[in-house]
């Protein structure tokens, strides 16, 4: 069971793609998907063990910062089931 959720929010698509690539390459996490927030903001989400998700978010944030602007990043260990209901379903 994946027990953590990692989020990296960027300004622009290039930063989001770079973050997603770095996250899945740097740790044993699964890419859940992305959400277009508006005004060019895109949030990329990954799931996995807490340690792996923390490492992935750090790597994704650093990679996205190199090519664009990171607005926010966060790790939620063990999200509540009510939060799970609003997340995209992983494959």
UniProtKB/Swiss-Prot annotation:
CDD domains on file: BMC_CcmK_like
SMART domains cross-referenced by the UniProt entry: BMC
Use in biotechnology or industry: Artificial BMCs can be made in E.coli by expressing pduA-pduB/B'-pduJ-pduK-pduN-pduU-pduT (in this order); pduT and pduU are optional, while pduA, pduB/B', pduJ, pduK and pduN are essential. A construct with the reversed gene order does not make BMCs. Ethanogenic BMCs can be made in E.coli by targeting pyruvate decarboxylase (pdc) and alcohol dehydrogenase (adh) to them. PduP(1-18)-Pdc and PduD(1-18)-Adh strains targeted to the BMC (PduA, PduB, PduJ, PduK, PduN, PduU) make significantly more ethanol than strains where Pdc and Adh are not targeted to the BMC.
UniProt subcellular location: Bacterial microcompartment
Disulfide bonds: none
Pathway: Polyol metabolism; 1,2-propanediol degradation
Annotated GO biological process: propanediol catabolic process
Principal cellular location given in the protein's record: other
Function: One of the major shell proteins of the bacterial microcompartment (BMC) dedicated to 1,2-propanediol (1,2-PD) degradation. At least one of PduA or PduJ is required for BMC assembly; it must be encoded as the first gene in the pdu operon. Required for structural integrity of BMCs and to mitigate propionaldehyde toxicity, probably joins facets responsible for BMC closure. Probably the hub for binding multiple enzymes to the interior of the BMC. Expression of a cosmid containing the full 21-gene pdu operon in E.coli allows E.coli to grow on 1,2-PD with the appearance of BMCs in its cytoplasm. Overexpression of this protein leads to an internal structure with a whorled architecture.
UniProt subunit comment: Homohexamer with a central pore. Interacts with PduP, which targets PduP to the BMC. Interacts with shell protein PduA.
Protein's name according to its UniProt entry: Bacterial microcompartment shell protein PduJ
């Amino acid at each position: 069971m994946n027990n953590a959720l990692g989020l990296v929010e960027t300004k622009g698509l290039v930063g989001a793609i770079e973050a997603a690539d770095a996250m899945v390459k740097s740790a044993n996490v699964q890419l859940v998907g992305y959400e277009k927030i508006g005004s060019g903001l895109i949030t990329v989400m990954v799931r996995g063990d807490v340690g792996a998700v923390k490492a992935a978010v750090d790597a994704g944030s650093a990679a996205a910062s190199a090519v664009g602007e990171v607005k926010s990043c966060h790790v939620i260990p063990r999200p509540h089931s009510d939060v799970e209901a609003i997340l995209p379903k992983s494959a």
